[in-house]
């Protein structure tokens, strides 16, 4: 599991160069990160290392990551945000 300091670093990494990604990724981190499995947390952190244009494409559903862990995490992020609209 992540220490408080490590979580703070992950939260900082959630801040992207695109507001559109901030609006999608930050709430997921705040509301879901603690409940993810260790493998899912690692996939989330790894996902944050991807370039913003790629993340935006995946989140918008215009493409899919070749990395299965990233694709699965994007699905979780999108589903979380869609569930808030229902």
UniProtKB/Swiss-Prot annotation:
Task: Give the stretches traversing the membrane.
Answer: none
Give one Pfam family, short name only: Sdh5
Q: Which UniProt keywords apply?
A: Chaperone, Cytoplasm
- What InterPro entries does its record include? SDH, SDH_sf, SdhE_FAD_assembly_factor
Q: Which GO terms describe its biological process?
A: succinate metabolic process
Record's subcellular location: Cytoplasm
A cellular component term, taken from the record's GO annotations: cytoplasm
What this chain does, per the record? An FAD assembly protein, which accelerates covalent attachment of the cofactor into other proteins. Plays an essential role in the assembly of succinate dehydrogenase (SDH, respiratory complex II), an enzyme complex that is a component of both the tricarboxylic acid cycle and the electron transport chain, and which couples the oxidation of succinate to fumarate with the reduction of ubiquinone (coenzyme Q) to ubiquinol. Required for flavinylation (covalent attachment of FAD) of the flavoprotein subunit SdhA of SDH and other flavinylated proteins as well.
For this chain, the family text in UniProt reads:
Belongs to the SdhE FAD assembly factor family.
* Name of the protein: FAD assembly factor SdhE
The record lists the organism as Aliivibrio fischeri (strain ATCC 700601 / ES114) (Vibrio fischeri)
């Amino acid at each position: 599991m992540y220490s408080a300091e490590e979580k703070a670093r992950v939260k900082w990494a959630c801040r992207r160069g695109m507001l559109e990604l901030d609006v999608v990724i930050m709430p997921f981190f705040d509301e879901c990160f603690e409940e993810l499995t260790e493998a899912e947390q690692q996939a989330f952190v790894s996902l944050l290392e991807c370039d913003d244009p790629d993340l935006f494409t995946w989140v918008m559903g215009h493409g899919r990551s070749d990395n299965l862990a990233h694709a699965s995490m994007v699905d979780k992020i999108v589903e979380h945000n869609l569930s808030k609209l229902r």
